[in-house]
């Protein structure tokens, strides 16, 4: 992940035997628990969110439009799929990923959701459950933002209840045929890669696949 200088001054730490100093921006002294690399990642995310994302929030809401270039920018900073090792990903800690998400969420939840869907709901399932060929085909381009991904789980009748979902997948030569309806799919309007949850009926029992 890229780094940037810190954007706020820390309150001074108390000297031995002195009075405790309260930092209203970090009342639990969370910053003291972070590694130097994690602080650099957080500061890079804070600078990006404040300088590049904040000016786009009003336009995004008024025009109901997501600027696709944001994923490319996040990819250049190493924010997409950051906890994955290899395949063009940063291999960062989950703490670092959480810090990035918090800084982007602070500016706009929609922008944070776009990053989280790409990273956690598209890239990680491909990394954890996909074939090596699928990992090599999709992950590097998803990591840079060249490809955008979406995640289809929620259905009109059962919401996000995995056990109750009605979408079905039927195995055919070369893949599966999907039948069913999904809704509220973040990133769907501009997605190139879609991870869709469905039930595969094999041997008389339902098997959930994505």
Task: Spell out what each predicted region is.
Residues 55-77:
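Short secondary-structure junction/hinge motifs that connect adjacent elements
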Residues 1-37:
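Intrinsic disorder at enzyme termini
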Residues 76-148, 186-193:
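Internal helix-loop-helix
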Residues 167-170:
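A structural signal for short hydrophobic beta-strand segments in well-ordered beta-sheet cores
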Residues 61, 65, 89, 158-160:
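Conserved, non-catalytic sequence blocks in retroelement Pol enzymes and Pol-derived host proteins
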Residues 32-53:
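Mature N-terminal segment immediately following signal peptide/propeptide cleavage
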């Amino acid at each position: 992940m890229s780094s940037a200088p810190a954007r706020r001054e820390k309150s001074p730490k108390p000297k031995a035997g002195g009075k405790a100093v309260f930092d209203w921006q970090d009342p639990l002294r969370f910053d003291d628990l972070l590694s130097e690399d994690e602080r650099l990642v957080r500061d890079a995310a804070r600078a990006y969110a404040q300088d590049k994302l904040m000016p786009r929030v009003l336009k995004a809401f008024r025009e109901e439009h997501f600027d696709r270039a944001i994923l490319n920018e996040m990819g250049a900073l190493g924010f997409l799929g950051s906890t994955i090792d290899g395949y063009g990903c940063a291999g960062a800690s989950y703490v670092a990923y959480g810090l990035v998400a918090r800084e982007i969420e602070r500016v706009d939840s929609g922008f944070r959701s776009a990053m989280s869907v790409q990273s956690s709901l598209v890239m990680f399932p491909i990394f954890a459950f996909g074939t090596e060929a699928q990992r090599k085909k999709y992950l590097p381009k998803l990591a840079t933002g060249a490809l955008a991904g979406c995640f289809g789980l929620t259905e009109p009748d059962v919401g996000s209840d995995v056990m109750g979902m009605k979408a079905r997948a039927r195995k055919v030569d070369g893949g599966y045929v999907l039948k069913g309806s999904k809704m509220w799919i973040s990133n769907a309007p501009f997605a190139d890669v879609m991870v869709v949850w469905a039930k595969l009926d094999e041997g008389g029992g339902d098997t959930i696949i994505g």
